[in-house]
Amino acid sequence: MAAPRSCALWSYCGRGWSWAMRGCQLLGLRSSWPGAPLSARLLPQEKRATETHFGSETVSEEEKGGKVYQVFESVAKKYDVMNDMMSLGIHRVWKDLLLWKMRPLPGTQLLDVAGGTGDIAFRFLNYVQSQHQRKQKRQLRAQQNLSWEEIAKEYQNEEDSLGGSRVVMCDINKEMLKVGKQKALAQGYRAGLAWVLGDAEELPFDDDKFDIYTIAFGIRNVTHIDQALQEAHRVLKPGGRFLCLEFSQVNNPLISRLYDLYSFQVIPVLGEVIAGDWKSYQYLVESIRRFPSQEEFKEMIEDAGFHKVTYESLTSGIVAIHSGFKL
């Protein structure tokens, strides 16, 4: 008998979002520096004897899930600060470029996996709100006979300010989601935002549910990347788009040597000084080196069923944005 699909904890911001979710067991998941937390099973449905890598260590697949979970549980409170310090703020530009590449239309339903502290989700909400407000202004200018009361009513309808767009943030790590919710409240994000505790390898959503699936700095921490990609394909609507922002392979030998020196000699030290956690940031650096190259990851996305798969390398290949469509 098949086990029920993963997790079931919903929390939400905004009126009108009360989706019924299926309950079940807590699974494990998480991402890396900059970005958002992702999947690796904490309580897998089937025990597997296969070995995998946790940074430079060789561990069982079952063990990796718990270790990755502990990493992001440990760094959650300092996650955003460390992202700025480690990347010198460049991670913000990379995420802005991801949104520019996405260019969501009004009414877009976005699933942000390993969304942790909300960087992609908040950018999405800002984008769709600004687009909708520009549309409103054009419409109001065309209706000069509206009273001031009617105009004010148009702008006070918070739910409508997003043009029907919604974002679901899915992460397995409760501490990361907690930080994200606190940021949302502090920055005034109330409508169009929902939070789900869930596993990227076994998403708690129906088929053909979302228009866009994003995952930023998370997929390399998934125990079974191929399974996470298949789940992304499953939950997207026909015509839906997969977008992944992830560390990649630097092709310039000189830049690669400098990048390695900085990654292994500086980042763990920053982790110890700022977050009091050397080991977690040592793992994050090691996990970057084990992630497939741009071309290899492109092939994995195609194997999951996506079409028109492309990628763009940023900052000499330190990161790359991969894109694919479900046809």
Swiss-Prot record:
<feature type="binding site">
    <location>
        <position position="171"/>
    </location>
    <ligand>
        <name>S-adenosyl-L-methionine</name>
    </ligand>
</feature>
<dbReference type="InterPro" id="IPR023576">
    <property type="entry name" value="UbiE/COQ5_MeTrFase_CS"/>
</dbReference>
<feature type="transit peptide" description="Mitochondrion">
    <location>
        <begin position="1"/>
        <end position="49"/>
    </location>
</feature>
<keyword id="KW-0472">Membrane</keyword>
<keyword id="KW-0808">Transferase</keyword>
<feature type="binding site">
    <location>
        <begin position="199"/>
        <end position="200"/>
    </location>
    <ligand>
        <name>S-adenosyl-L-methionine</name>
    </ligand>
</feature>
<dbReference type="GO" id="GO:0032259">
    <property type="term" value="P:methylation"/>
</dbReference>
<dbReference type="GO" id="GO:0008425">
    <property type="term" value="F:2-methoxy-6-polyprenyl-1,4-benzoquinol methyltransferase activity"/>
</dbReference>
<comment type="subunit">
    <text>Component of a multi-subunit COQ enzyme complex, composed of at least COQ3, COQ4, COQ5, COQ6, COQ7 and COQ9. Interacts with PYURF; the interaction is direct, stabilizes COQ5 protein and associates PYURF with COQ enzyme complex.</text>
</comment>
<dbReference type="Pfam" id="PF01209">
    <property type="entry name" value="Ubie_methyltran"/>
</dbReference>
<dbReference type="GO" id="GO:0031314">
    <property type="term" value="C:extrinsic component of mitochondrial inner membrane"/>
</dbReference>
<comment type="similarity">
    <text>Belongs to the class I-like SAM-binding methyltransferase superfamily. MenG/UbiE family.</text>
</comment>
<protein>
    <recommendedName>
        <fullName>2-methoxy-6-polyprenyl-1,4-benzoquinol methylase, mitochondrial</fullName>
        <ecNumber>2.1.1.201</ecNumber>
    </recommendedName>
</protein>
<dbReference type="GO" id="GO:0006744">
    <property type="term" value="P:ubiquinone biosynthetic process"/>
</dbReference>
<keyword id="KW-0496">Mitochondrion</keyword>
<dbReference type="InterPro" id="IPR029063">
    <property type="entry name" value="SAM-dependent_MTases_sf"/>
</dbReference>
<keyword id="KW-0809">Transit peptide</keyword>
<comment type="pathway">
    <text>Cofactor biosynthesis; ubiquinone biosynthesis.</text>
</comment>
<dbReference type="InterPro" id="IPR004033">
    <property type="entry name" value="UbiE/COQ5_MeTrFase"/>
</dbReference>
<comment type="function">
    <text>Methyltransferase required for the conversion of 2-decaprenyl-6-methoxy-1,4-benzoquinol (DDMQH2) to 2-decaprenyl-3-methyl-6-methoxy-1,4-benzoquinol (DMQH2).</text>
</comment>
<keyword id="KW-0489">Methyltransferase</keyword>
<keyword id="KW-0999">Mitochondrion inner membrane</keyword>
<feature type="binding site">
    <location>
        <position position="117"/>
    </location>
    <ligand>
        <name>S-adenosyl-L-methionine</name>
    </ligand>
</feature>
<keyword id="KW-0831">Ubiquinone biosynthesis</keyword>
<keyword id="KW-0949">S-adenosyl-L-methionine</keyword>
